C-alpha cells in the first residue's frame, strides 16, 4: 500500500508521486506518516522532509507551510522546497556562513529575528545535503 504525496510551492510542483512513508517536520515536532494514517491538518515547520520512495530514503528542505493528510493522500503546501539533489553544497555552506555572520551583526530585535530565520533556512539546506539516505 502506498501514499500519494504532492509537495507544492506557489510557483511549482516539487513532488507528485506515490511513496511508502514520509517523516515530516511540523511545528510540534516530527511525525511519521504511513498508509491509512488518521486524517490531520498541520503546520509545517522549516525542516527536512524524508521520503521513502522505491525502498530508498530521499530528503527535501521545506521552508514552512501547511500539510493535509487523509485517505492515503498527503498534500504539502510550502513557501519553498528543494530536493537534496538540487542543492549546491558549496552555495549552501556559504549561505550558512553568511547567515551566521548576519546574526552576529544584528543590532535590533527585528534584525535578530530575520537573521535567526535565515539561519534556520540555511541550516536546513545544509542538513538536507548531509542527511543519511
Swiss-Prot record:
Q: What is its main location?
A: plastid
Q: Give the UniProt entry's GO cellular component terms.
A: chloroplast thylakoid membrane; proton-transporting ATP synthase complex
Return the CDD domains for the record: F1-ATPase_delta
List all membrane-crossing ranges: none
InterPro entries, alphabetically? Answer: ATP_synth_F1_dsu/esu (IPR001469), ATP_synth_F1_dsu/esu_N (IPR020546), ATP_synth_F1_esu_C (IPR020547), ATPsynth_dsu/esu_N (IPR036771)
GO molecular function annotations of the record: ATP binding; proton-transporting ATP synthase activity, rotational mechanism
- Annotated keywords: ATP synthesis, CF(1), Chloroplast, Hydrogen ion transport, Ion transport, Membrane, Plastid, Thylakoid, Transport
Topological type in the membrane: Peripheral membrane protein
Where in the cell?
Plastid, Chloroplast thylakoid membrane
User: Which domain of life, per UniProt?
Assistant: Eukaryota
Q: Which Pfam families match?
A: ATP-synt_DE, ATP-synt_DE_N
Q: What does this protein do?
A: Produces ATP from ADP in the presence of a proton gradient across the membrane.
**What family does the Swiss-Prot or TrEMBL record give for this protein?**
Belongs to the ATPase epsilon chain family.
SUBUNIT field: F-type ATPases have 2 components, CF(1) - the catalytic core - and CF(0) - the membrane proton channel. CF(1) has five subunits: alpha(3), beta(3), gamma(1), delta(1), epsilon(1). CF(0) has three main subunits: a, b and c.
PANTHER family documented for this protein: ATP SYNTHASE DELTA/EPSILON CHAIN, ATP SYNTHASE EPSILON CHAIN, CHLOROPLASTIC
Protein name in the entry: ATP synthase epsilon chain, chloroplastic
What is the source species? Answer: Citrus sinensis (Sweet orange)
